[in-house]
Design a protein with these regions (language model features):
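N-terminal cationic-hydrophobic initiation segments that often serve targeting/anchoring roles
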Residues: 5, 27-31, 56, 113-114, ...
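A cross-family glycoside hydrolase active-site/sugar-binding cleft signature
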Residues: 16, 37-39, 65-67, 95-97, ...
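Active-site gating/metal-coordination segments in enzymes
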Residues: 11-12, 19-95, 143, 147
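Short, charged, surface-exposed secondary-structure boundary motifs
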Residues: 45-50, 74, 131-134, 159-160, ...
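Catalytic pocket-lining loop regions of alpha/beta-barrel enzymes
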Residues: 76-174
Length: 214
């Protein structure tokens, strides 16, 4: 992964994986290249909360990753609340996979954002592959200052421009979802979205650097 990052001029990557120890090892080996976020399954209850606290304190992880599709929950389910509470207490952003029914729909993520307005939420894939969900991600995020959009896997280049111009120029992040998606493909989609160079620089790196205080 580091070799591919070098090939495409990527300075740092925000990474997560179902097995947090894999990310621990990557961050330990390449502390200047990787920023870890903790994969958390809300069904694990107190164990999940303890994992988040440990990864932040012992391994300098900087956020929480929730995957409603893989772990079979909806973001607006109360089972998620203990993790959101620790996110609020520790000022951790929460990255949430979006786009796949019935578990990962944008409206359920927005409902969670309404319940926890002090927690910064990143809607990963900004609705993903369905135009209806992509538009919902944009339209709903406009109304909630604590919601940010990440671009990986979202196929409509014009929606990156729309999100940047309507949701906010500090609230859209480029992402790769590597190794599932190719760095260059994800880059090209953003490059051709019709925004000026200064805006592309915000999306590609300035916004996430500011967001995570890197």
């Amino acid at each position: 992964m580091v070799a591919e990052m070098d090939r495409y001029g990527i300075e740092k990557s925000v990474v997560s994986y179902m097995d947090n120890t894999v990310v621990e090892q990557a961050v330990k080996r390449f502390p200047d290249r990787f920023v870890g976020i903790t994969w958390a399954n809300p069904y694990e209850g107190d164990k999940a909360v303890e994992t988040v606290v440990r990864e932040v304190r012992e391994h300098c992880f900087q956020g929480i990753k929730l995957h409603p599709l893989l772990n079979a929950f909806t973001a607006n389910d109360a089972v998620v609340h203990p993790l959101m509470e620790v996110a609020q207490q520790m000022d951790l952003p929460v990255f949430i996979h979006s786009g796949h029914p019935p578990f990962s729909l944008p409206h359920s993520i927005i409902q969670l954002a309404e319940d926890f307005p002090k927690v910064r939420i990143v809607m990963v894939h900004m609705g993903h592959g369905n135009g209806i969900y992509i538009q919902a991600a944009i339209d709903l995020s406009k109304k909630h200052d604590n919601v940010y959009l990440e671009t990986s896997g979202m196929p409509m280049h014009t929606k990156i421009r729309e999100a940047y111009n309507t949701v906010g120029n500090e609230r859209v992040f480029w992402g790769s979802d590597a190794p599932f998606h190719h760095y260059r493909v994800e880059m090209l989609r953003t490059e051709v979205c019709g925004l000026p160079e200064s805006a592309l620089e915000n999306i590609f790196y300035r916004n996430i650097k500011r967001f995570l205080a890197l």
